Regions:
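Hydrophobic core segments of alpha-helical transmembrane domains in multi-pass membrane transport
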Residues: 9-20, 35-47, 95-107, 176-184, ...
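Cytosolic juxtamembrane amphipathic/interface segments immediately preceding
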Residues: 19-23, 77-86, 125-126, 150-159, ...
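Hydrophobic alpha-helical hairpins/lids featuring a short glycine-rich hinge
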Residues: 69-131
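Alpha-helical membrane segments and immediately flanking helix-loop junctions
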Residues: 126-186, 391-478, 482-490
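Long, contiguous bundles of hydrophobic transmembrane helices that form the permeation core
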Residues: 200-254
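Transmembrane helical segments that form the transport core of multi-pass membrane transport proteins
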Residues: 249-423
């Protein structure tokens, strides 16, 4: 059944892209079919075929090895903080890795290695799909760098691109992530294999949705022989490393500031929504009632009381308060879920489930997004009992951004023994298939705030196209999101088959 659901999801995503097309008769079947086949074939090779899985693991291990070298610099700056003596610290273990990878990529660009790889892969995409060289090069560059850096490889041609080419460049940037932030996601616990696979699948996936929603109707420039030199090229390797580190620091500061602001704003919104929810019968009152009922059920026998007290003690320790000072409505709802889910005594099963359900039912922005995007998550292959949680992450990624979504998703990637979170609707850890689907679905810059980034980046390179960029921005977010969801659906399909 899950295989059938994944296939249905693929068809529906293609149909949605077709519905959004601005010229259905002009769709080039060779380009669209070829892009889909490349995206699916690559996903199948690295997620299903044993040799491909081994290659993907080798690449991922190599990237992890490079990240480990970044830790030497982190330890030099932060000392024992880098050794997790105070637990996982985002500002210590993630943001510096972004700086390191930005510097490394700048060095690879200076040495010409990145251009060589982009030229080969971009040329292959061009020949396979019949797309122009400019959009193929930009799509390939997005595998390695971000939405503002990738267009630099075709910067002189942006003012004269056709509208379809410009749209493809926009979608390519939104469907992918930068290599520097990919390292940051890996440090948060997202499997590197999934991040690498998603980055490569984003190139054909972005072109697929771009050419489905905005097919080419004009003649294109297809006479680019070599990639243009960067007029701001560093004078030597050291200059490249330094400029890359500076750019990485700016990116890391932006990421840190963004997370601080958005997580705080989400907490504020949740507080406001929670008050409204309590008036509607949700929230604290329902949780307190369910908890009191569990207390009464546990008082029936000493054995039940001991089991209840054990869970209560674990909750108090997590909240850093004494048991007699613990107020069930004032602690983190996820802690309540984790503490009372393990109560397996038949006499307490119903009452403890009521507590877990009441804690999970607390109205929040994440819950609202979960219900809105729940059908979409189910459509791309997430089991129904995990679809609301998955839908919440997808919604956060589109409405806020992928870094915030990954930060809320990361605890579910851990083993329960290492402090991982339980899915409230199932009472157990998240399934491996759902972890994979969400990892792929979130792996892209396609969100509302990225429209402003595109306007600033591409608009600065071609001020004459700023009006078109603004007009196409929302459609590009839709296309980029569809590309991410297609990769996620295919990943779920091949993981199920394997």
């Amino acid at each position: 059944m899950s295989i059938v659901m994944s296939l249905v999801g693929v068809v529906v995503l293609l149909f949605v892209g077709f519905l959004f097309s601005n010229n259905k008769k002009a769709i080039n079947l060779r380009t669209v079919a070829g892009a889909f086949l490349i995206q699916a074939a690559f996903g199948g090779f690295v997620l299903y075929v044993p040799v491909g899985k081994d290659i993907l693991k080798g690449v991922s291990d190599a990237v992890y090895s490079v990240i480990d070298k970044a830790n030497d610099g982190i330890r030099f700056l932060f000392g024992d903080l880098a050794n997790f003596k105070m637990g996982f610290l985002f500002v210590v273990h993630v943001l510096p890795v972004i700086v390191f990878f930005s510097s490394l990529i700048a060095v690879l660009y200076y040495l010409g290695i990145m251009q060589w790889v982009i030229r080969i892969l971009g040329g292959a995409l061009q020949k396979a799909l019949g797309t122009s060289r400019t959009e193929s090069m930009a799509a390939t560059a997005n595998i390695f760098v971000g939405q503002t850096e990738a267009p630099l490889v075709v910067r002189p041609f942006i003012p004269t691109m056709t509208e379809s080419e410009l749209f493809a460049v926009m979608v390519g940037g939104l469907a992918s992530i930068a290599g520097s932030v990919m390292a940051g996601y890996a440090q948060m616990g997202v499997p590197m294999e999934y991040l690498v696979a998603a980055s490569f699948m984003a190139a054909p996936g972005g072109l697929l949705m771009a050419k489905l929603m905005h097919p080419e109707t004009q003649s294109t420039q297809d006479d680019i022989i070599t990639l243009p030199d960067d007029p701001d090229k560093p004078s030597n390797v050291l200059d490249a490393a330094a400029s890359g580190a500076s750019a990485g620091m700016q990116l890391a500061l932006n990421v840190g500031a963004m997370l601080l602001a958005f997580v705080g704003l989400i907490a504020l919104i949740n507080s406001m929504i929670g008050g409204i929810g309590e008036m509607l019968g949700y929230g604290d009152a329902a949780l307190a009632t369910a908890f009191n009922a569990l207390q009464q059920a546990a008082a029936a026998t000493p054995e039940l009381q001991a089991a209840f007290n054990g869970s209560l003690q674990a909750l108090a320790e997590q909240a850093h308060v004494a048991v007699n000072a613990l107020a069930i409505t004032e602690v983190d709802r996820q802690w309540v879920i984790d503490a009372f889910t393990p109560l397996q005594q038949p006499e307490l099963a119903a009452a403890s489930k009521a507590v877990v359900d009441a804690a999970a039912a607390h109205i929040s922005l994440e819950m609202i997004l979960g219900y809105i995007f729940m059908p979409l998550a189910w459509l791309i292959g997430v089991p129904w009992n995990e679809a609301m949680l998955a839908g919440s992450f997808i919604g956060q990624k589109i409405v806020v951004n992928e870094f915030v979504a990954y930060s809320y998703f990361a605890p579910y990637l851990k083993d329960l023994a290492d402090g991982g979170q339980i899915v409230a609707q199932t009472g157990v850890a998240m399934s491996d298939k759902t972890k994979a689907i969400i990892s792929f679905a979130l792996c892209g810059f396609a969100n509302l705030s990225s429209i402003a980034i595109l306007l600033g980046g591409l608009g600065g390179m071609a001020p004459s196209r700023r009006h078109e960029l603004a007009r196409l921005g929302m459609r590009a977010v839709v296309a980029g999101s569809l590309a991410n969801l297609m990769s996620a659906t295919l990943a779920g399909l091949f993981i199920t088959l394997s």
